Amino acid sequence: MTMPKIMILPDKYPCSITSILITSRCRVTMYNQKNTLYFNQNNPNNHMYSPNQTFNEIHWTSQELIDTIQNFLQHLGIIEDIYTIYILVS
């Protein structure tokens, strides 16, 4: 099994996350500022930000963004290659 495809639009760094769009053949889910992007408080492996800090307040580098999105997807149970993940940044 391979991981989902992750696309970052536009591809610029440092950046802040505006929205995360998760798509598959039968499902589309969007995370944005309205339904604030909080990461799992119980994830002790991520030391880049405090557990309750929103994604859009962080100025990401390329590798930090990819690593954190992969952790976020695993937290959501999205680990199959049937998904495409679009990360909209500003």
Swiss-Prot record:
A Pfam family the protein falls into: Pneumo_M2
InterPro entries noted in UniProt: Pneumo_M2-2
Taxonomic superkingdom: Viruses
Coiled-coil regions listed: none
Locations listed in the record: Host cytoplasm
Cellular component, GO, one term: host cell cytoplasm
Main localization (coarse): host cell
Alphabetical keyword list: Host cytoplasm, Viral RNA replication
Role of this protein: Mediates the regulatory switch from transcription to RNA replication. Acts late in infection by inhibiting viral transcription and up-regulating RNA replication. Inhibition of transcription by protein M2-2 requires phosphorylation of the phosphoprotein.
Protein family (similarity comment): Belongs to the orthopneumovirus M2-2 protein family.
Protein name, as recorded: Protein M2-2
Organism (species): Human respiratory syncytial virus A (strain A2)
